Amino acid sequence: MFPQTTMDHILHPTPREGYYVVELNRSVWVVPNYYINLTPIGTGAYGTVCAAECTRSGTRVAIKKFNRPFQSIIHARRTYRELRLLRCMCHENIIDLLDVFTPNENVNDIEDVYFVSMLMGADLSNILKIQRLNDDHIQFLVYQILRGLKYIHSADIIHRDLKPSNIAVNEDCELKILDFGLARQTDSEMTGYVATRWYRAPEIMLNWMHYTQTVDVWSVGCILAELITGKTLFPGSDHIDQLTRIMSVTGTPDEEFLKKISSEEARNYIRNLPKMTRRDFKRLFAQATPQAIDLLEKMLHLDPDRRPTAKEAMEHEYLAAYHDETDEPIAEEMDLNDDVRADTIDEWKKIIWEEISDFQKNVAFADEEEDEEKMES
């Protein structure tokens, strides 16, 4: 039996100078003193998010604490990938990284990583639970998703995990794409496991090793359908059920499409399925406008080669009220360090520690420049 004082120390470790400890939903958070009034607002597979006030800036922020970022090499790589991507990206429809910190005092002890971003009012999954949106709102939201995607894709990056809970919206209907932990640069052999199943493109489940940025466009199609109907389009209970639900809407693929599938097992499985005819989207989405239906048909095409790109989808007549090519920026060249490799947890700790240190140096330098400008003016 531990003495009570020892137990208290284990549950609530003594924080480093400038930090304090707070327990939230049975989880111990150790944060800088200038983040106050922490309130839990969400939990996911990879982290927990709290709202907080930043006394330095006088703004409300969201703080994300990663769940066991160094539990495995996969967890560590995911944390690094998201940190690197968010540092490189700068776009109105992509969440901004305001701060990143660890409460641990040296690289050997690093266990926790926290990201800080602007606090948004809600995410799309929250909104879908409480209200139905009119067509103008739907157009504006989908346009902003695609605007962010165009930027992401122009950097040769695939998000791979677009879903309502990864899309934040404020009270002015302004939208930001969240959670880049599964995002990665395109390569010749893309891994099969990504994304929440319900929004996952069929070519990923069909075990193709190579897929393209149009997997994200499929996800946007699923989100658009859900915004229109208020219901998840393909709520599969497992991979097989998911694929069956998709084909009950898109119809059984033809031989031309099947030839593109590299997995012989997947091809044979599909050939042995009962023939399904394509559903009439006008009946399936009876409440949608003809323009919305046309865009849905294009984005939810079973053949990824026949889906539009994010840029092409933005140019669709359904989004004509918002499309403005002069205000749809693409990314500058990004140094994502995507070739960084580490074989041990300790090596990943060193890489992430250095990334956090570099971020904080750049923020401190920017703050100094801002102070100098204020003094000069």
Swiss-Prot record:
The keyword Coiled coil does not apply. The modification Phosphothreonine is found at T191. Its EC number is 2.7.11.24. Disruption phenotype: Knockout causes reduction in adult lifespan. Upon infection by P.aeruginosa or E.faecalis, RNAi-mediated knockdown results in a decrease in survival rate and in a reduced up-regulation of gst-4 and gcs-1 expression. Causes a severe reduction in rnt-1 accumulation in the intestine during oxidative stress mediated by paraquat. Upon exposure to C.cinerea galectin Cgl2, adults show reduced survival and larvae do not develop. Larval development is partially restored in a bre-1, fut-8, gly-13, galt-1 or ger-1 mutant background. The modification Phosphotyrosine is found at Y193. Divalent cations such as magnesium or manganese. Dually phosphorylated on Thr-191 and Tyr-193, probably by sek-1, which activates the enzyme. Increased phosphorylation in response to the heavy metal arsenite. Increased phosphorylation in response to intestinal colonization by probiotic Lactobacillus fermentum strain JDFM216. GO terms for molecular function: ATP binding; MAP kinase activity; metal ion binding; protein kinase activity; protein serine kinase activity; protein serine/threonine kinase activity; RNA polymerase II-specific DNA-binding transcription factor binding. It catalyses: L-seryl-[protein] + ATP = O-phospho-L-seryl-[protein] + ADP + H(+); L-threonyl-[protein] + ATP = O-phospho-L-threonyl-[protein] + ADP + H(+). GO terms for cellular component: cytoplasm; cytosol; nucleus. InterPro entries: Kinase-like_dom_sf, MAP_kinase, MAP_kinase_CS, MAPK_p38-like, Prot_kinase_dom, Protein_kinase_ATP_BS. Residues 35-319 form the Protein kinase domain. Its cofactor is Mg(2+); Mn(2+). Interacts with transcription factor atf-7; perhaps in a manner dependent on dual specificity protein kinase sek-1. Serine/threonine kinase which responds to activation by environmental stress and pro-inflammatory cytokines by phosphorylating downstream targets. As part of a MAP kinase signaling pathway, plays a role in modulation of lifespan and immunity. Phosphorylates skn-1 which probably regulates skn-1 nuclear translocation in response to oxidative stress. Probably by activating skn-1, involved in the up-regulation of gcs-1 and glutathione-S-transferase gst-4 expression upon bacteria infection. Up-regulates expression of gcs-1 in intestinal cells upon arsenite treatment. Belongs to the protein kinase superfamily. CMGC Ser/Thr protein kinase family. MAP kinase subfamily. This is Mitogen-activated protein kinase pmk-1. The gene is pmk-1.
